[in-house]
């Protein structure tokens, strides 16, 4: 799977994604894990997706996104986290997604968005 560029696992019943740290996805550009039953994404701190541009974790059961502070996805342009259980987005102040253009957070439990004035995503597009 070294040359795999797109992995779409949308709409399954996936709960555990720890296997990602054991697989070599050097060329992966798009990973869709949306519409599953994932709640723990800590494994993302252990994987190396050097070319990942799109990560879709929407429609899962994710509540804790603090691991995003430790991931190093230099090429990430789109991050989908809509329809999860996220309430705290303070970690966004610390993440280093220099090329992020699109961040999708609708359908969560976020009540305080004041942190957004401190977020520095150089390429983020606002409609």
Go through each PLM region and give its residues:
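Low-complexity/repetitive intrinsically disordered segments
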Residues: 1-19, 32, 109-127
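Intrinsically disordered, low-complexity segments enriched in polar/charged small residues
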Residues: 34-35, 42, 64, 82-83, ...
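A structural signal for leucine-rich repeat
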Residues: 1, 17-26, 41-49, 65-74, ...
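Conserved hydrophobic beta-strand positions in leucine-rich repeat
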Residues: 4-9, 28-33, 52-57, 76-81, ...
């Amino acid at each position: 799977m070294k040359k795999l560029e797109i992995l779409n696992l949308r709409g399954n019943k996936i709960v555990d994604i720890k296997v990602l740290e054991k697989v070599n996805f050097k060329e992966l550009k798009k990973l869709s894990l949306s519409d599953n039953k994932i709640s723990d994404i800590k494994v993302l701190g252990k994987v190396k997706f050097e070319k990942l541009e799109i990560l879709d974790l929407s429609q899962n059961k994710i509540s804790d996104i603090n691991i995003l502070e430790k991931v190093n996805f230099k090429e990430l342009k789109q991050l989908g986290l809509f329809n999860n259980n996220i309430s705290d987005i303070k970690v966004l102040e610390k993440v280093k997604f220099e090329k992020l253009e699109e961040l999708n957070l609708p359908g969560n439990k976020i009540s305080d968005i004041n942190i957004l004035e401190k977020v520095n995503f150089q390429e983020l597009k606002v409609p």
